[in-house]
Amino acid sequence: MKRRTFLLSGAAVTLALPALANTAPVLKVLKSPTCGCCTAWVDYVRQAGFTVEAEDVDQDELWALKDRLGVTPELSGCHTATIGEYFIEGHVPAPDIARLLSERPTARGLTVPGMPMSSPGMAGPGAGDTFDTLLIGLDGATSIFASHS
């Protein structure tokens, strides 16, 4: 009897996995159509397992989104994404996004300001830059969420 229950439980979980995958939040990215590093970052997060919807927009539309989200120029990157109730600004590493979604802190989102050369979508690991992923709180205050070298 125990073996039958175990096998039925395993089958139920296997059948449920596709439905669970479909409930994962979608990473919606707005980016410039001419930015190669933005496209490389989108490819990177897709390869990391995220479902991504990318849209090419002009700079006015991109900055309008950043303004609505409260992303200041000094905290901005070259592309902006949203996932669930959070924003993801710039070249944020996929493990940081996964951690954000797992821990669910009270915050607006994550940012990697600027375009650090060793960040995902840029020149790649070992390019020389160390960088921090910053958590932006509801009040706009930042704190280091993760450090990368």
Regions found by a protein language model. Name each.
Residues 26-27, 51, 85-87:
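Short active-site oxyanion
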Residues 53-63, 83:
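Thiol-based oxidoreductase modules, predominantly thioredoxin-like and allied folds used
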